[in-house]
Swiss-Prot record:
The active site is at residue 491. This is Polyphosphate kinase. Keywords: ATP-binding, Kinase, Magnesium, Metal-binding, Nucleotide-binding, Phosphoprotein, Transferase. One of its GO terms (cellular component) is membrane. Pfam families: PP_kinase, PP_kinase_C, PP_kinase_C_1, PP_kinase_N. It comes from Mycobacterium tuberculosis (strain ATCC 25618 / H37Rv). Its EC number is 2.7.4.1. GO terms for molecular function: ATP binding; magnesium ion binding; polyphosphate kinase activity. Its cofactor is Mg(2+). The keyword Ligase does not apply.
Length: 742
């Protein structure tokens, strides 16, 4: 067990040498000539306090804590709780691979640029380490003390080797020798065998063995294979009545793979004594950049960088909390890990593998099955009607997963591919599924002789390999594949279909908030606009020309496009909302801004919202993840509330509403630097009153005082809402009931 003393990090011991300018204030003595008084501020309302931002990294950890709260919620179906434990773990892995890795790189390079809330990279790393250790311990305790016993009560057991009887051990001996032993490679460490490379996110056993002859001890590492199931399913047993109720259900029993390997270490090290063994796991830096302006072939350059990703420097070491001091010291030394990057975990490491447990066939322990409904505009009729005919009658707003993706957006692309009157299809692809029907439709369209353009973002993090494969498949089919603009990720969700209709050419469009991915569309909440509006069609034509050619159009008719137009466009609308509010009078103004997004970090947008709040505009923010805005602070944000909704579906849509100026916008951009400065993003205005009424209903549901959520306080703390004793409604459940297929 690692002592608290050893956990004192360099972050705490090393003084921060950077001093802020205000700490060098010079005060003259009594005999010196005093400076003139400071200038009176021109506008007090424009002066914003320096502590107005919350730290974005700590806010992300708060988001993951909300995920963990769902896992701890005993009102949730049991296997859904296990699922949220897995999501928490995989979320934290990615946070360390990207965000923590970036902070460590800046710290190691001596780049002491402070965050918006005034912290250096080293100070942030210190706070992240402390908060992560607390969260990791809580995560483990929710599993060990709550979810694991509850699984046992339902006849689902995760057992240890000590729990098995001799017959089970004999069967597992055969399984080990036939299925596991051949793929294991025990690696010794001695003068002839250097310390082995440990790949990122792999689960390993650190083993100490002793030679019986002279008592010499040696270290060895055994990697738990990642191409076999983490949990070995044992032969079924009849569950006890207590565990399985009166149904006589057989018990499901699983043994962690590391337990099986540990039991057979003598087979791996014959003739040696096993002194100790402990599980550990390393996380490596996966935050890399491709020098696009230097490399002629972006695809090849990206493939080279992907090959290097597995060799990134360590950013976190997770260890079982029973690991000895000597074993840990060896790992720290050989892996070049700082003590401050060690996370002690009670029980099992890497609970992301609980997805395997979630997959068991126990529907009563999961959310009730939900089948998305076909949007009424696209419902089957006695006389078949194409999507194009429907869109000629009017725009359609789809809300996934409540409205089926496959019978709306996917069908839109599939009909375009099969329609002989369609001349061209242009589409952006950021993340798509492994067997994507969208991509297959584009391939079919190209093979049918249509002009097909696909903007494939091969730099979509952790989906690079899949997107490279799709890009090559599309090119082989004759699709014109482009990778967007140098230095920018193409993150917008847009599709354009050009169709000949008699003597005219008509353009049909889709602008959405979510990816063209039929699998995640069943799990992610998103909205999309399907339209034949000429102005949006002309805008998307200009946008695709700028992405595939040398056009550098910066202004559009009905779109806001990053990196040049979204931040300025939003701030302009906030200011217009303030002006409209003031024009109505201090007590009669109807200024109200409602925002729904994944993250709110951009300081310029936040400051614009603060100024609007000071002017009396009511502001309501629904944010899934990071929020750097501090709501409810006296003198700056009394008129701002921030709430977060998490649940069965991942809230992914980005929607903006400015009531006084009567504008609704949807699109792909969150309010983050990367979205507004380093990505091609699109926001589209929704003008049809029938569709804006749908968006208004969505906001009203999310902001209902009885809606189950968390609310952010001025101190940066999130609080569950509503309080006990009040009626509670579930935002997503209410939408499912409204859209549920008959």
């Amino acid at each position: 067990m690692m002592s608290n003393d050893r956990k004192v990090t360099e972050i705490e011991n090393s003084p921060v040498t950077e001093v802020r300018p205000e700490e060098h204030a010079w005060y003259p003595d009594d005999s010196a000539l005093a400076a003139p008084p400071a200038a009176t501020p021109a506008a007090i309302s424009d002066q914003l306090p320096s502590d107005r931002y919350l730290n974005r990294e700590l806010s992300w950890l708060d988001f993951n804590a909300r995920v963990l709260a769902l896992a701890a919620d005993k009102s949730m179906p049991l296997l859904e709780r296990a699922k949220f434990l897995a999501i928490f773990a995989s979320n934290l892995d990615e946070f360390y691979m990207v965000r923590v890795a970036g902070l460590k790189r800046r710290d190691e390079m001596g780049l002491s640029v402070r965050s918006a809330d005034g912290l250096t990279p080293r100070e942030q790393l210190g706070r992240i380490g402390e908060q992560t250790q607390q969260l990791a311990s809580r995560h483990a305790r929710v599993f060990l003390d709550s979810v694991l016993p509850a699984l046992g009560e339902e006849g689902i057991y995760i057992v240890t080797w000590a729990d098995l009887d001799q017959a089970e051990r004999d069967r597992l001996s055969t399984y080990f020798n036939e299925q596991v032993f051949p793929v294991l490679t025990p690696l010794a460490v001695d003068p002839a065998h250097p310390f082995p490379f440990v790949s990122g996110l792999s689960l390993n056993l650190a083993v100490t063995v002793r030679q019986p002859e002279d008592g010499t001890q040696h270290f060895a590492r055994v990697k738990v294979p990642d191409n076999v199931d983490r949990f070995v399913e044992l032969a079924a047993r009849e569950a006890s009545e207590e565990a399985a109720g009166t149904e006589g259900r057989t018990a499901l029993r699983f043994l962690p793979m590391e337990e099986l390997i540990a039991a057979f270490l003598p087979v791996l090290f014959p003739g040696m004594e096993i002194v100790e063994h402990h599980a550990f796991r390393i996380t490596r830096n996966a935050d890399f950049e491709v020098e696009e302006d230097r490399d002629e072939d972006l695809l090849q350059a990206l493939e080279r960088e992907l090959a290097r990703r597995r060799f990134g420097s360590p950013v976190r070491l997770e260890i079982a909390d029973d690991m000895t001091e000597s074993m840990l010291e060896l790992l720290l030394r050989e892996l070049d890990v700082h003590p401050g990057d060690v996370i002690e975990v009670p029980g099992l490491l890497d609970l992301s593998s609980l997805w395997q447990i979630y997959a068991v066939d126990r529907p009563t322990l999961k959310d009730r099955t939900f089948v998305p409904a076909t949007h009424p505009a696209f419902a089957e009729r006695e006389t078949p009607k194409s999507i194009f005919a429907t869109l000629r009658e009017g725009d359609v707003l789809v809300h996934h997963p409540y409205d089926s993706f496959s019978t709306s957006v996917q069908r839109f692309i599939e009909q375009a591919a099969a329609d002989p009157n369609v001349l061209a299809i242009k589409q952006t692809l950021y993340r798509t599924s492994g067997d994507s029907p969208i991509v297959r439709a584009l391939i079919d369209a190209a093979e049918a002789g249509k002009q097909v353009v696909a903007l494939v973002e091969i730099k979509a993090r952790f989906d690079e390999q899949a997107n490279i494969a799709w890009a090559r498949a599309l090119e082989q089919a004759g699709v014109h594949v482009a990778y967007g603009l140098v230095g920018l990720k193409t993150h917008c969700k847009t599709a354009l279909v050009v169709r000949r209709e008699g003597p005219t050419i008509r353009r049909y469009c889709h602008v959405g908030t979510g990816n063209y991915n039929s699998k995640t569309a069943r799990l992610y909440e998103d909205v999309g606009l399907l339209t034949a509006a000429p102005d949006i069609g002309a805008d998307l034509t200009d946008l695709f020309n700028s992405l595939t050619g040398y056009s550098r159009k910066l202004s559009y008719r009905n779109l806001l496009v990053a990196p040049h137009g979204i931040r300025a466009g939003i701030i302009d609308r906030v200011e217009r909302e303030v002006a409209a509010h003031r024009a109505e009078g201090a007590h009669n103004g109807k200024g109200r801004i409602r925002l729904k997004m994944n993250a709110l970090v951009d300081e310029q947008v936040i400051d614009a919202l603060y100024r609007a709040s000071r002017a009396g505009v009511r502001i309501e923010v629904v944010v899934r993840g990071i929020c750097a805005l501090r709501p409810g602070a006296q003198g700056i944000s009394e008129n701002i509330i921030v709430r977060s909704i998490l649940g069965r579906f991942l809230e992914h849509s980005r929607i903006l509403h400015f009531r006084a100026i009567d504008e609704f916008w949807i699109g792909s951009a969150d309010m983050m630097h990367r979205n507004l400065d380093r990505r091609v993003e699109v926001m589209a205005q929704v003008k049809n009153p029938r569709l804006t009424a749908q968006l208004d209903e969505l906001f009203e549901s999310a902001l209902d005082p009885c809606t189950r959520c968390w609310e952010l306080g001025p101190d940066g703390q999130w609080t569950a809402s509503p309080q006990e004793g009040h009626s509670v409604r579930d935002h997503q459940e209410s939408l499912m009931e409204r859209h549920r297929s008959p």
